[in-house]
Swiss-Prot record:
Species annotation: Bifidobacterium longum (strain NCC 2705)
Protein name as it appears in the record: Chaperone protein ClpB
Region described as C-terminal: spans on this chain: 775-889
Binding annotation for ATP 2: G616, P617, T618, G619, V620, G621, K622, T623
Record field: compositional bias (Low complexity): 525-535
Location of region: Disordered: 515-539
Compartment(s) where it occurs, according to its Swiss-Prot or TrEMBL record: Cytoplasm
Designated gene of the protein: clpB
Assembly and interaction partners: Homohexamer. The oligomerization is ATP-dependent.
C-alpha cells in the first residue's frame, strides 16, 4: 500500500504510529493521523482546512485533547500498535478519492478527505463541529493545488510552486513597498522593448555590483502598475523567482527538477501573463545538477527559445563572462542590457528621490547637504564599490547612527544618574553612623543629592520634550508616506471618491501639521544657535558632517570639517615634526605643505597626497621623518606601510608587491603593497633604500605616482589617492659629506647620480626631491636629548628618573659626532655609555624603583652614573658626592 502514498503521506502515517506507540495506545486512530497531518511543516492539511472555512489551530487543540482521553495500556509493550477499523476505512476512502481525482498517488489531502468522509470517527466529528466537511475539503483542493495533479511521490512540494518560490513585484509595487526608481529611463525602455519581442524576449541586465540592476526591474514593476507601459505589457504580473529556496531542502534526486518544472508549468499555463525575474541569473548554470541530472539552465533553454517564458536576468559582468558566456546556446537566448554606474549628479537625484523613505523609516530629518556629501565623498574616498549603492549606504548608516543616539540617553543625563546612585549609596551608609562628623557630612550630602536630583529632573523633562518633538515629526512623515501609497492604490482601482478624500482632505491636513512641527524645530534650532545653552541635547538632522563621520569610520580617512584644534595643529605641523627630526627644515616643510593641501581639500583628487624622494647620507632622519609623519597623522608611528626595497633586488620579486599572476603560487594572498593600502587607504607608505630595488619595480610605481591607482594580481584596483609616498635613498651621499665642495656643486653631483639610476619618467612624476643635509655638531645636541628621552621613557614603569648634566650632554654630542654616519653612532654611544652601565647597576641592586640616576662627565674616558637613593649616593665613582649632585643640579 505504501507504494501508492506520497512521501509526506507516508511520513504522516509513520508519525501517527510512533505517537500511538509512545502514548501506549493499543491502536492507531484517525486522531493520530490527523494530529500528524496538522503538525507537518510545509504540509497541505492546514492550508486545506483554512480554504474549507475551518480554523486549523482550534481543530488541532481539539484533536490533542481527544488524544489525551484515549485509553493507554500500562507497562511496556514491544508490539507495534495496529490500525483501528476507523483508520483502515479512512485510508480506503482516501484511495477512492485519489482515483476520482485522477491522481496517481495518495497524498495528504486524500488522507484528510478520507478521514472526513469515513464517518463515524472522532476526527470527522471534530472537523464537522468546526464547519469542515468532506464536500468543502473537495471543493478547496483545486485552489490549494494550483490546478496540479499528484503524479509523483513529492507532489505536495510542487503545489502552488510559483507562490512558494517567488515574490510578486507588481503586488509589492501596488502596496508601495518598493523604493522609487529615479532615472534609468533608457534601461527600462530597452527592457520593455526586448520583452515585447516575439521570440528570445529575455533581457539580461549586466553591470557592476551596486549600480542598480535590480532597481531597473523594480522600476518596470512600478510602471506596469501605473499603466505606463505598451499594451503588450499592461496588466502583466512581474515575479521574482528565488532559486535558492527552490534548491534548499530538495533531499531526493529529482526533487529540484520537480519544483522547477511545476513553476515553469504554472508560468506556461498563465498564457504570457507572467514575466519572470531571476536575480543572479548566473546561478541557473549548474543549479540542481548532480550525477548527470539536468541543471536549471538546460531546463529553461527550450522555453526561452520559443518565447513561452519571458525572463529578465540580472548579473555582474564577471559572473556573466564566467557562467553564461561559456554556454553559447544559453547566451544566444538572452539580449544584453548594460547598466552603467550613474554620475555623481545622477546619484544626488536618486538620493533625493529616496530621501522621504529613509526619513520615514528612521524618523529623522535628512538635509540636502547630507545627500550631496554622500554622493561626492563616496565617489572620492570609497573605492571598490559603485554608485549609487555606496552613497545610499552612507545616508542609511548616518540616519541609523542618529536614530540610535536619539533613542539613547544623552551623556549629561547618564553622568547625573550615576552621581545620584553614588550619593544615595553614601547616604545609606552615613545614616547608620552616629558620630557628629558623619551627621554633618550627611546634611551636606542630602543638600547635594537634592540639587543633583533637581538638575536630573530638569534635564529629563527637557529630553522627553525633545524626544516627543522628534517622534511627532517622524510619525507624521510615516503617516504621510502611507497615505500617498493608499491614494495611489485607490486611483489605480478607480475608487476616485476615496482617492480624492485622501488627496484633498487627509494629506493636506497632515502636511499642515508636519510643516508646523518642522517650523517649531527650526525655531528651536535658531534659538540654540543664538544661545548655546538652548542647544538640543541630540540633533535630529543628518547633515554633511554626519555623513563625513561615517566615511571616516569606514575608511579611516579624516574627511570631516576641520575643527579649530586641528587647524592649529596643522598650522604648526613643522614645530611638531621638528622636535622629532633635527636639522631638516626643507624636508619637513615639503611634507607639511602636502598634508595641509590634502586636509584643506585643495590637493589634486586624482593623485597621491604627496610623493617624495628623500636623498641624503645615512642616519640624518629620512626614515625617522616618515615615522614622525605617521605619528602626527595617526597618533601611532607603526601606522605606516614600510617596504624594505633591499628585499626586491630580483626581477621576479615585483610580483610580491602587487600579488602573483593567476596560476602562480601565492595568487590568492595578494601583494604586500596593494593589500596593505587596500586595508588602510589613508596611510604613509615608505619605500626604504629605494636605490637597491630592481629597476622594473619603478615601472610598477609609475601608475601610482601619476593616477593614484594600482591594479593588483587579481585585477582589483587599489586606490592610492589618500596616501603619502616617501622613498628614501643614499645616492650621492658621498658628495653631501664632502666638505671641499660648495652647496651648488654638491646638489649637482647628487642629482647627476639620481638621473643615472632612475628613469626620467619616474623622477618627473614625483612631487619633490628633497635633500637631507649632514648633521652639524650643534644639531647633534638636540638628538642627544631625543636619545636620552628614549632611555628615560623606558624607565618610567619603574619610576626611575634620569638626570643628565650639561657636561655629559656635551661629551655625548662631541664623541658621537661623525658627519659620514649621521646620528646612528650617537645612538650606539648612548646605548653603551648610558644603557649598558645602567643595566649593570640595576642587576647589581645599586638602583631601585623610584631612584634618581645622575649621568655626569668629569673628564674621564666614559660617563659616570650615580644612583641617588634617599639621602645617599650609590656610585661606581667614589669622588662623586651629594654636594656634587646638588651643585650640578
Amino acid at each position: 500500500m505504501e507504494q501508492k502514498f506520497t512521501t509526506m503521506a507516508q511520513e504522516a502515517v509513520g508519525d501517527a504510529i510512533q505517537s500511538a506507540s509512545a502514548a501506549g495506545n493499543a491502536q492507531v486512530e484517525t486522531l493520530h493521523v490527523m494530529d500528524a497531518l496538522l503538525r507537518q511543516e510545509n504540509g497541505v492539511a492546514r492550508s486545506l482546512i483554512e480554504a474549507a472555512g475551518g480554523d486549523p489551530q482550534a481543530i488541532g487543540a481539539a484533536v490533542r485533547n481527544a488524544l489525551v482521553a484515549l485509553p493507554s495500556a500500562s507497562g511496556s509493550s514491544t508490539s507495534q500498535p495496529q490500525a483501528s477499523r476507523q483508520l483502515t476505512a479512512a485510508i480506503a476512502q482516501a484511495e477512492k478519492e485519489m482515483q476520482q481525482m485522477g491522481d496517481e498517488y495518495v497524498s495528504t489531502e486524500h488522507l484528510l478527505i478520507g478521514i472526513a468522509a469515513s464517518k463515524p470517527n472522532q476526527s470527522a466529528e471534530i472537523l464537522e463541529k468546526n464547519g469542515v466537511t468532506a464536500a468543502s475539503l473537495r471543493k478547496a483542493v483545486p485552489g490549494v493545488r494550483g490546478g496540479a495533479k499528484v503524479t509523483s511521490p513529492d507532489a505536495e512540494g510542487s503545489y502552488k510552486a510559483l507562490e512558494k518560490y517567488s515574490t510578486d513585484l507588481t503586488a509589492a509595487a501596488k502596496e508601495g513597498k518598493l523604493d522609487p526608481v529615479i532615472g534609468r529611463d533608457q534601461e527600462i525602455r530597452r527592457v520593455i522593448q526586448i520583452l515585447s519581442r516575439r521570440t528570445k524576449n529575455n533581457p539580461v541586465l549586466i553591470g557592476e555590483p551596486g549600480v542598480g540592476k535590480t532597481a531597473v526591474v523594480e522600476g518596470l514593476a512600478q510602471r506596469i502598475v501605473a499603466g505606463d507601459v505598451p499594451t503588450t505589457l499592461q496588466g502583466k504580473k512581474l515575479i521574482s523567482l528565488d532559486l535558492g529556496s527552490m534548491v534548499a531542502g530538495s533531499k531526493y534526486r529529482g526533487e529540484f527538477e520537480e519544483r522547477l518544472k511545476s513553476v515553469l508549468n504554472e508560468i506556461k499555463n498563465a498564457d504570457g501573463q507572467i514575466i519572470t525575474f531571476i536575480d543572479e541569473i548566473h546561478t541557473i548554470v549548474g543549479a540542481g545538477a548532480a550525477e548527470g541530472s539536468m541543471d536549471a539552465g538546460n531546463m529553461l533553454k527550450p522555453m526561452l527559445a520559443r518565447g513561452e517564458l519571458r525572463l529578465i536576468g540580472a548579473t555582474t559582468l564577471d559572473e556573466y563572462r564566467e557562467n553564461i558566456e561559456k554556454d553559447p546556446a544559453l547566451e544566444r537566448r538572452f539580449q544584453q542590457v548594460f547598466v552603467g554606474e550613474p554620475s555623481v549628479e545622477d546619484t544626488i537625484a536618486i538620493l533625493r528621490g529616496l530621501k522621504q523613505r529613509y526619513e520615514a523609516h528612521h524618523k529623522v530629518t535628512i538635509g540636502d547637504d547630507a545627500l550631496v556629501a554622500a554622493a561626492t565623498l563616496s565617489n572620492r574616498y570609497i573605492s571598490g564599490r559603485q554608485l549609487p549603492d555606496k552613497a545610499i549606504d552612507l545616508v542609511d548608516e548616518a540616519a541609523a547612527h542618529l536614530r540610535m543616539e536619539l533613542d539613547s540617553s544623552p551623556e549629561e543625563i547618564d553622568e547625573l544618574q550615576r552621581k545620584v546612585t553614588r550619593l544615595e549609596m553614601e547616604e545609606m551608609q552615613l545614616k547608620k553612623a552616629e558620630d557628629p562628623a558623619s551627621k554633618e557630612r550627611l546634611g551636606k550630602l542630602q543638600a547635594e543629592l537634592a540639587d543633583t536630583r533637581e538638575k536630573l529632573s530638569g534635564l529629563k523633562a527637557r529630553w522627553d520634550a525633545e524626544q516627543a518633538g522628534h517622534n511627532k515629526v517622524g510619525d507624521l512623515r510615516a503617516k504621510l508616506d502611507d497615505l500617498r501609497v493608499q491614494a495611489d492604490k485607490y486611483t489605480r482601482e478607480g475608487n476616485l471618491a476615496e482617492a480624492s478624500k485622501i488627496l484633498y482632505g487627509e494629506i493636506p491636513s497632515i502636511q499642515k501639521e508636519l510643516a508646523a512641527a518642522e517650523s517649531a524645530d527650526a525655531e528651536s534650532a535658531d534659538a540654540s544657535a543664538a544661545n548655546p545653552a538652548d542647544e538640543p541635547m541630540v540633533p535630529d538632522r543628518v547633515d554633511a558632517d554626519s555623513v563625513a563621520e561615517i566615511v571616516s569610520d569606514w575608511t579611516g580617512i579624516p574627511v570631516g570639517r576641520l575643527m579649530q584644534g586641528e587647524n592649529e595643529k596643522l598650522l604648526h605641523m613643522e614645530d611638531y615634526l621638528g622636535k622629532r627630526v633635527i636639522g631638516q627644515k626643507e624636508a619637513i616643510a615639503a611634507v607639511s605643505d602636502a598634508v595641509r593641501r590634502s586636509r584643506a581639500g585643495i590637493s589634486d583628487p586624482n593623485r597621491p597626497t604627496g610623493s617624495f624622494l628623500f636623498l641624503g647620507p645615512t642616519g640624518v632622519g629620512k626614515t625617522e621623518l616618515a615615522k614622525a609623519l605617521a605619528d602626527f597623522l595617526f597618533d601611532d608611528e607603526k601606522a605606516m606601510v614600510r617596504i624594505d626595497m633591499s628585499e626586491y633586488m630580483e626581477k621576479a620579486s615585483v610580483s610580491r608587491l602587487i600579488g602573483a599572476a593567476p596560476g602562480y603560487v601565492g595568487y590568492e594572498q595578494g601583494g604586500q603593497l596593494t593589500e596593505a593600502v587596500r586595508r588602510r587607504p589613508y596611510s604613509v607608505v615608505l619605500f626604504d633604500e629605494v636605490e637597491k630595488a630592481n629597476p622594473e619595480i619603478f615601472d610598477v610605481l609609475l601608475q601610482v605616482l601619476d593616477d593614484g591607482r594600482l591594479t593588483d594580481g587579481q585585477g582589483r584596483t587599489v586606490d592610492f589617492k589618500n596616501t603619502i609616498l616617501i622613498m628614501t635613498s643614499n645616492l650621492g651621499s658621498q658628495f653631501l659629506v664632502n666638505e671641499d665642495m660648495d652647496a651648488d656643486a654638491k646638489k649637482k653631483a647628487v642629482m647627476d647620480a639620481v638621473h643615472m639610476n632612475f628613469k626620467p619618467e619616474f623622477l618627473n612624476r614625483l612631487d619633490d626631491i628633497v635633500m637631507f643635509h649632514p648633521l652639524t655638531r650643534e644639531e647633534l645636541g638636540g638628538i642627544v636629548d631625543i636619545q636620552v628621552a628614549g632611555v628615560s621613557q623606558r624607565l618610567t614603569d619603574r619610576r626611575i628618573t634620569l638626570d643628565v648634566t650639561d657636561s655629559a650632554r656635551e661629551w655625548l654630542a662631541n664623541t658621537g659626532y661623525d658627519p659620514a654616519y649621521g646620528a646612528r653612532p650617537l645612538r650606539r654611544l648612548v646605548q653603551t655609555e648610558v644603557g649598558d652601565q645602567l643595566a649593570r647597576m640595576l642587576l647589581a641592586g645599586k638602583v631601585h624603583d623610584g631612584d634618581t640616576v645622575l649621568v655626569d662627565q668629569t673628564g674621564g674616558e666614559h660617563l659616570e652614573l650615580s644612583a641617588w637613593a634617599s639621602d645617599q649616593i650609590v656610585s661606581d665613582n667614589p669622588d662623586v658626592s651629594v654636594d656634587n649632585v646638588t651643585e650640578d643640579k
